């Protein structure tokens, strides 16, 4: 009986490793003030189209700021006033990819950007 429980636990553990959530950001770079940049986030390991998604950033002072939200179907988006009208979040559920188009960039937009589920 004990052996059977161990075997089931081992199988469940191995299955869990296969389902690891991964979010891989790309597209960053150096841009002058007033410039534009488009970030991408490739998602895997979960049903991307079923989840609302966001972009957050960490400033050089290590402060975390939320910058954009999009609903699972893409019909609803929200932004803080600091980026509204300059940043656009979008998604391609067929490609499991999240995007952030940033324009009219300012020095205060300098940060590390991360996508979040």
UniProtKB/Swiss-Prot annotation:
Keyword terms of this UniProt record: Adaptive immunity, Disulfide bond, Immunity, Immunoglobulin, Signal
Signal peptide (residue range): 1-19
Region described as Complementarity-determining-1: spans on this chain: 50-54
UniProt keyword Disulfide bond, yes or no: yes
Framework-1, as annotated region: 20-49
MF (Gene Ontology): antigen binding
Listed Pfam families: V-set
Region Framework-3, residue ranges: 86-117
Top-rank taxon: Eukaryota
Any GO BP: immunoglobulin mediated immune response
Annotated spans, Framework-2: 55-68
Annotated Gene3D superfamilies: Immunoglobulins
GO CC annotation: extracellular region; immunoglobulin complex
InterPro entries named in the record: Ig-like_dom (IPR007110), Ig-like_dom_sf (IPR036179), Ig-like_fold (IPR013783), Ig_V-set (IPR013106), IgHV (IPR050199)
Complementarity-determining-2: annotated segments: 69-85
Keyword Iron-sulfur among UniProt keywords: no
Disulfide bonds: 41-115
SUPFAM superfamilies, A to Z: Immunoglobulin
PROSITE patterns: IG_LIKE
Extra remark: This sequence belongs to the VH7183 subfamily.
Protein's UniProt name: Ig heavy chain V region 345
Species this protein is from: Mus musculus
């Amino acid at each position: 009986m004990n052996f059977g429980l161990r075997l089931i636990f081992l199988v469940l553990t191995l299955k869990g490793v296969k389902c690891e959530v991964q979010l891989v950001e790309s597209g960053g770079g150096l841009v002058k003030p007033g410039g534009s940049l488009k970030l991408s986030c490739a998602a895997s390991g979960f049903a991307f189209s079923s989840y609302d998604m966001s972009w957050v950033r960490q400033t050089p002072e290590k402060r975390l700021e939320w910058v954009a939200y999009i609903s699972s179907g893409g019909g609803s988006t929200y932004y803080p006033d600091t980026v509204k009208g300059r940043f656009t979040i979008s998604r391609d559920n067929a490609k499991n990819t999240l995007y952030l188009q940033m324009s009219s960039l300012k020095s205060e937009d300098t940060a590390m950007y991360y996508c979040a589920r």
